[in-house]
């Protein structure tokens, strides 16, 4: 980073699991940080699965706006050098589709960048997208990537192999005494902690590599991860396997009732079928993450 000019970064998705870590990571590297949010309050609240609450010193400027409504974003890019976005649906609540959020909201950011002096756009997509292009979430993410490639913007793509926040569900089930897996759980993965992934995002923003895959230090099957969760929770292993044929049938029924929930269910089921392994860029182990969840659970039973 230049010694003469502090670079300014915009964090879009700052109230999400990864976005909170990203804001802290950029600030720790000396950046001036602006966050885009619908809710000031949510910035300073802890998120699920040990996502941190941001502190006042983590943020230089709070821009309150609705990313789906460009008319609320006037001035958002003023003075900004780098745009970082991990905007996307993580938990389906508002009845919005992946197309409306994961694609269109990021497209709105890109359009704003075209008329500004942005030096780089950093976008968080997903690893292994080529293998699951039939999914609505993948199509939305990769439309953003395609648009970035054609935009003329200087861009970087980060492709995580899954998030520890998603693995938190395995600990929650184990702590309650029974875990449910879609399929036998033989698929291999190495998800990454949000803190480690945020560091990868900053490295990518500053580096020359255009697309970066990022995984954690542990490669294991989904079943092994579930068994590890029981070990940390101090509970006997009790795993119920939902057969793929049944899971696929349920996805179809859910899709008939709600396109949005059907798309999300389809993604969850497909994730139980395919491997998601990439370069080991994280250092935090899944066991350490489960232990942090267990410690928090013990304090607030």
Located regions from the model:
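NAD(P)H-binding glycine-rich loop region in Rossmannoid oxidoreductase-like domains
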Residues: 41-45, 50-108, 112-115, 130
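Amphipathic terminal alpha-helices
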Residues: 271-301
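Glycine/proline-rich active-site loop of Rossmann-fold NAD(P)-dependent oxidoreductases
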Residues: 165-172, 203-212, 235-236
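Substrate-positioning beta->alpha
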Residues: 105, 183-205, 210
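Terminal hydrophobic/aromatic helix or amphipathic segment near a protein terminus
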Residues: 224-273
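N-terminal Rossmann NAD(P)H-binding glycine-rich loop of SDR-like oxidoreductase domains
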Residues: 2-32, 37
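Glycine-/Pro-rich loop/turn segments that contact NAD(P) or position catalytic residues
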Residues: 89-175
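Glycine-rich Rossmann NAD(P)(H)-binding loop
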Residues: 182-187, 212-220, 230-234, 242, ...
């Amino acid at each position: 980073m230049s010694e003469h000019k502090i670079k300014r970064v915009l964090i879009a998705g700052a109230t999400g699991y990864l976005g909170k870590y990203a804001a802290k990571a950029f600030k720790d590297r000396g950046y001036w940080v602006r966050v885009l949010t619908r809710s000031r309050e949510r910035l300073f609240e802890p998120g699920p699965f040990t996502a941190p609450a941001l502190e006042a010193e983590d943020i230089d400027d709070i821009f309150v706006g609705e990313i789906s409504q460009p008319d609320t974003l006037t001035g958002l890019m003023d003075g900004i050098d780098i745009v970082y976005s991990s905007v996307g649906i993580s938990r389906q609540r508002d009845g919005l589709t992946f197309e409306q959020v994961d694609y269109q909201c990021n497209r709105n950011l890109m359009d704003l960048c075209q008329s500004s002096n942005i030096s780089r756009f950093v976008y968080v997509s997903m690893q292994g997208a080529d293998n699951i292009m039939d999914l609505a979430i993948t199509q939305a993410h990769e439309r953003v990537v395609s648009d970035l490639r054609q935009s003329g913007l200087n861009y970087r793509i980060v492709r995580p192999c899954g998030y520890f926040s998603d693995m938190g569900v395995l600990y929650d089930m184990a702590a309650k005494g029974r875990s449910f897996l879609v399929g036998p759980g033989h698929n291999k993965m190495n998800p990454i902690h949000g803190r480690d992934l945020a560091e990868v995002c900053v490295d990518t923003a500053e580096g020359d590599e255009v697309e970066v895959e990022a995984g954690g230090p542990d490669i294991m099957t989904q079943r092994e991860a579930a068994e590890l969760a029981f070990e940390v929770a101090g509970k006997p292993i009790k795993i119920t396997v939902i057969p793929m044929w049944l899971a696929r049938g349920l996805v179809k029924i859910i899709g008939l009732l709600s396109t949005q929930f059907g798309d999300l269910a389809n993604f969850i089921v497909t994730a139980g079928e395919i491997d998601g392994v990439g370069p080991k860029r994280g250092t935090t182990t899944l066991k350490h993450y489960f232990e942090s969840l267990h410690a928090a659970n013990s304090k607030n039973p």
